[in-house]
């Protein structure tokens, strides 16, 4: 409803509308926390050896960062297995590499170079899809049947698909 209220029924979503859609922004952050684009980030330890709590990380070591586990850590996210976009209303967290509890695109010098474009395109695309389609489950599928669990692989796929129905002929 937020999108149709802000944008209106007879207009298309524009980039300037995105800043007026806080719930959409929260849904996208929560989606990236709950279903990151990939489960891991790979980094290489530059510089000298590093010791953390009596564990030595050697220079040039490959480091695997489990961003899926960070997004499901109850010490960081209350009710981590629950999809709750509202958690971002009172929490200043972005996914642009500044907050390490939400780093789906990496951080620092190795952050995804396409992030500025992806940020705009994801918001604009999701807002346009919500604005222009009514979303419904396939016949015979109830909301209780929807399983948001992933199947592990190079990409994370949803187990039960949704059907997009155009709102305008």
Residue ranges of model-derived segments:
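Juxtamembrane membrane-interface segments of multi-pass membrane proteins
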Residues: 1-10
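Conserved cytochrome P450 K-helix E-x-x-R motif and the immediately C-terminal K′/meander segment
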Residues: 11-55, 74
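Conserved cytochrome P450 K-helix/beta-meander segment immediately N-terminal to the heme-binding cysteine loop
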Residues: 18, 47, 65-93
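C-terminal helix/juxtamembrane-tail motif
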Residues: 62, 135, 153-169
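Hydrophobic, repeat-rich solenoid/adaptor surfaces of innate immune receptors and signaling proteins
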Residues: 61, 66-67, 122, 126, ...
């Amino acid at each position: 409803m937020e999108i149709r209220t802000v944008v209106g029924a007879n207009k298309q979503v524009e980039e300037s509308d995105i800043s007026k859609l806080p719930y959409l922004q929260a849904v996208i952050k929560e989606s990236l926390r709950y279903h990151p684009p990939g489960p891991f980030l790979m980094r290489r330890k530059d510089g000298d050896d590093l010791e953390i709590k009596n564990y030595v990380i050697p220079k040039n070591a490959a480091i695997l960062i489990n961003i899926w586990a960070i997004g499901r850590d109850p010490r960081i996210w209350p009710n981590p297995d629950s999809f709750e976009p509202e958690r971002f209303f009172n929490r200043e967290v972005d996914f642009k590499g500044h907050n390490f509890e939400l780093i789906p695109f990496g951080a620092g010098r190795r952050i995804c170079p396409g992030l500025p474009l992806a940020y705009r395109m994801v918001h604009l695309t999701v807002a346009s899809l919500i604005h222009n389609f009514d979303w419904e489950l396939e016949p015979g599928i109830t909301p209780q049947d929807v399983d948001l669990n992933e199947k592990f692989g190079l990409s994370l796929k949803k187990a039960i698909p949704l059907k997009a129905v155009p709102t305008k002929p």
